[in-house]
Design a protein with these regions (language model features):
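Residues within well-ordered beta-strands of beta-sheet-rich folds
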Residues: 70, 157, 173-175
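Extracellular carbohydrate recognition
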Residues: 165-173
């Protein structure tokens, strides 16, 4: 019984560690299919990402929380990088590397709801691209586009303009994962019900 109670309590702690139903909000943008000359097309398609947009007007989150960045792949002749002064990130990658999951963590930081981001792809010999610029693509769940991503993870691709603006955006692939600081109401309710159940079993055991 003690083991059962301990296991149940541990499960409730894990449930409580979940996050609210919050995520990234993408404003505007027309999505296009990821082209075949993107070296990571099949890898992105396997993640149900088959579109990308470069003409969006804003990207933000709808709740306070933490954003964690991971780098996943690079196909480019230039030394390219990703930076954010707010997150304290300034990473440079001189060599190509294949697509990797879960990827390598390159930094994280706390954000407020509706905060503006200072994320930027950089290139030693190409053209830098900040959020909202042509070289900075956001991969989408479908090629039809959406005004609200509604997801906790955003996948971003860079086109350094090294071979001209080919818009394949595989010169560096980075993801940003958002975790809300506020537990969702359903999780709080589950915790309450679970604790009540633990109390019931504990009382019943004492009575036996």
């Amino acid at each position: 019984m003690k083991r059962l109670l301990a296991t149940t309590a541990f499960g409730l702690v894990l449930a409580m560690s979940g996050t609210a139903d919050a995520g990234f909000i993408l404003s505007g943008g027309t999505s296009n299919s990821i082209p075949g000359n993107n070296d990571f097309q099949s890898d992105l398609n396997a993640l149900a990402l088959d579109g990308f947009t470069i003409d969006y007007t804003d990207l933000t989150v709808d709740a306070p929380g933490t954003i964690t960045f991971r780098v996943h792949g690079k196909e480019a002749g230039f030394t390219n990088g990703f930076e954010s002064s707010d997150a304290g990130i300034d990473e440079q990658y001189p060599s190509d590397f294949g697509f990797d999951l879960p990827g390598t963590v390159i930094g994280s930081y706390s954000v407020a709801d509706m905060e503006d981001f200072d994320w930027m792809f950089t290139s030693a010999a190409g053209v830098d691209a900040a959020l909202g610029e042509q070289g900075f693509a956001i991969f989408t769940l479908n090629a039809n586009g959406s005004s609200n991503i509604g997801t906790s993870v955003v996948w971003m691709g860079f086109d350094d303009d090294g071979a001209g603006p080919d818009d394949n955006h595989d010169d560096l692939i980075v993801s940003a994962r958002f975790a809300s600081a506020v537990p969702e109401p359903a999780t709080i309710g589950l915790l309450g019900a679970g604790l009540a159940g633990l109390g019931f079993f504990a009382r019943r055991r004492r009575m036996c």
